[in-house]
A protein has these predicted regions:
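Basic, flexible linker segments flanking DNA-binding modules
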Residues: 1-61, 139, 148, 159-165
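RNase H-like DDE/DDD metal-dependent nuclease/strand-transfer catalytic core used by mobile genetic elements
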Residues: 47-51, 57-178
Length: 178
């Protein structure tokens, strides 16, 4: 139509290319080659005991459910097992969308650094040399231990409170949840 030709002539973007709240054109983070940018993030997943949670068994079974899973071997300062959550650590190559993921007991700095070491070794086995890593500003990714695990790889962080920047891994976590 005529309206479309005029808008195209003046470089006006389509509505689907715009961010609804701000009206600005959405900038996409796309890497040109395999290994240019790897997105890394952690998803917190609640542990549900075998047989279901309190909605299935009733709230009176809460004490029984609390002691069901002691398999992690990780304890809090009161020597009680950390039974509330599992943490899904994920690394996704931004170009090929190749995923390395592990379900771990926590999201501490040592765990995140060890995960990255294994993920980087796995990417190397697949023939991918990682150049940059994009993470959020979580404490495990700001630590010196994680920085040392990265070595010569460039570390980029997302803007605070802006998970859309790390959208590839966020979408992967949502796909797993659905």
């Amino acid at each position: 139509s005529t309206v479309h030709r005029v808008l195209t002539r003046y470089g006006v973007a389509r509505l689907r290319w715009l961010d609804r709240p701000t009206g600005r054109v959405i900038r996409r983070i796309e890497s040109a080659a395999v290994g240019d940018l790897v997105h890394v993030d952690v998803k917190k997943l609640g542990k549900i005991p075998a047989g279901g949670g309190w909605k299935m068994l009733g709230q009176t079974k809460g004490g029984h459910n609390a002691s069901v899973d002691r398999s992690s071997g990780v304890f809090n300062k009161h020597r009680q097992p950390l039974r509330g959550y599992h943490f899904l650590h994920t690394a996704i190559d931004g170009h090929s969308r190749l995923v390395y993921s592990e379900l771990l007991a926590d999201e501490r700095k040592d765990t995140a650094a060890a995960f990255w070491t294994r993920a980087n070794a796995w990417f190397n086995e697949c023939g991918i040399t990682v150049q940059k890593v994009l993470t959020d500003n979580g404490s495990c990714y700001r630590s010196h231990v994680f920085r040392d695990a990265l070595g010569t790889i460039e570390h980029r962080r997302t803007r605070p409170y802006r998970p859309q920047t790390n959208g590839k891994v966020e979408r992967f976590h949502r796909t797993l949840a659905d």
